[in-house]
């Protein structure tokens, strides 16, 4: 949009400058240049390059105060990273203590050891809400069975049954994503090697391999999960309105979702919905005229015309909007988000990439939500 174009104009390469933290021996690395970087950001007040600061138990108070002064400008910098959490997390991935202490921030928010790692961050973006949508359609999208069948949602009698269906859809879709990522990873190694970059990454020359072939000392693949707040809110709405308070039947909720709560669909969504209806009618042996197709598409564009149905759809939407939402320190909703995020992370860790490394999850609760 206009605001984004104004604020992030130009060709940003997502360079990220890191200050503070500690060196390989565990000694504080804050120096005069760290303070100058903060002062420069205060003068320019530009969103790029990104500027990150590493904070730990040995960070000087003067540096913390200077960081806070930059934060107070409202420019959105610096980003703060907690060594006490990140260093043990990197070590749990097989990174040595000395290397973990010297991590830098790559791109937006991803920590890794510079000059020794091929992390392939942003390898893919996983929509946490997609499995929820597929639960309602029993794995069908636009008339095609694109995922596993988890049962007719209207036959589910407990939230546990519904939630298990969500987790099954999530796990299956993660598997599809991993297969696609690994195919691309293999293609990169065969078709687009990066010899100059590889010369600067430790072990590539020694192994005689580019980073795409697994020459780096550390190899990871990091697909990002996003939409976790919306996912938690969606699961909470189903649990509360359908199963706990029984204010809405599952059939009503499914129908309301199909019709976008009677508000009409976008032209692209209306076209896709119309195609699905026509395909299903054809499978049933029923022919449709061009005029009928146009009427179906018009119905999706304008929304539900029946006043009683439209009123009920609006009631359901109002009930959903009035429910508590993620991010308000409500334990039950937060636990849903945490559980799904944990499933995402643990499922990814089961997979290996063609470079001999492991998958590790990233989560973007804000940037891509």
Where are the language model's segments positioned?
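Conserved catalytic cores of very large enzyme subunits
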Residues: 1-369
């Amino acid at each position: 949009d206009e605001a984004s174009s104004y604020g992030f104009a130009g060709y940003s390469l997502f360079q990220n400058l890191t200050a503070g933290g500690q060196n390989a021996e565990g000694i504080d690395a804050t120096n005069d240049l760290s303070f100058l970087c903060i002062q420069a950001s205060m003068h320019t007040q530009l969103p790029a390059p990104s500027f990150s600061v590493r904070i730990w138990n040995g960070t000087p108070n003067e540096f913390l105060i200077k960081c806070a002064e930059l934060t107070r400008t409202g420019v959105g910098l610096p980003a703060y990273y907690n060594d006490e959490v990140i260093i043990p997390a990197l070590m749990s991935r097989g990174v040595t203590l000395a290397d973990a202490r010297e991590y830098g921030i790559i791109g937006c928010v991803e920590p890794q050891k510079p000059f020794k790692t091929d992390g392939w961050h942003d390898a893919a973006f996983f929509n946490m809400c997609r499995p929820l949508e597929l639960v309602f359609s029993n794995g069908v999208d636009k008339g095609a069975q694109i995922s596993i069948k988890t049962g007719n949602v209207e036959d589910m009698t407990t939230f546990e049954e519904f939630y298990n269906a969500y987790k099954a859809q999530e796990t299956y879709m993660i598997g599809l994503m991993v297969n696609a990522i690994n195919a691309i990873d293999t293609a990169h190694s065969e078709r687009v090697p990066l010899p100059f970059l590889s010369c600067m990454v430790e072990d590539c020359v020694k192994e005689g391999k580019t980073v795409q072939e697994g020459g780096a000392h550390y190899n990871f693949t990091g697909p990002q999960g996003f939409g976790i707040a919306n996912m938690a809110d969606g699961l909470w709405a189903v649990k509360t309105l359908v199963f706990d308070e029984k204010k809405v039947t599952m059939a009503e909720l499914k129908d309301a979702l199909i019709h976008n709560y009677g508000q009409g669909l976008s032209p692209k969504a209306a076209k896709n919905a119309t195609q699905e209806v026509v395909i299903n009618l054809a499978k049933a042996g029923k022919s449709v005229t061009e005029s009928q197709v146009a009427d179906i598409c018009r119905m999706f564009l304008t929304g539900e015309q029946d006043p009683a149905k439209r009123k009920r759809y609006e009631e359901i939407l109002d009930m959903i909007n009035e429910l508590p939402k993620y991010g308000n320190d409500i334990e039950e909703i937060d636990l849903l988000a945490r559980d799904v995020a944990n499933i995402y992370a643990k499922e990814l860790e089961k997979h290996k990439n063609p470079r001999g490394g492991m998958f590790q999850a990233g989560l973007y609760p804000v940037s891509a939500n």
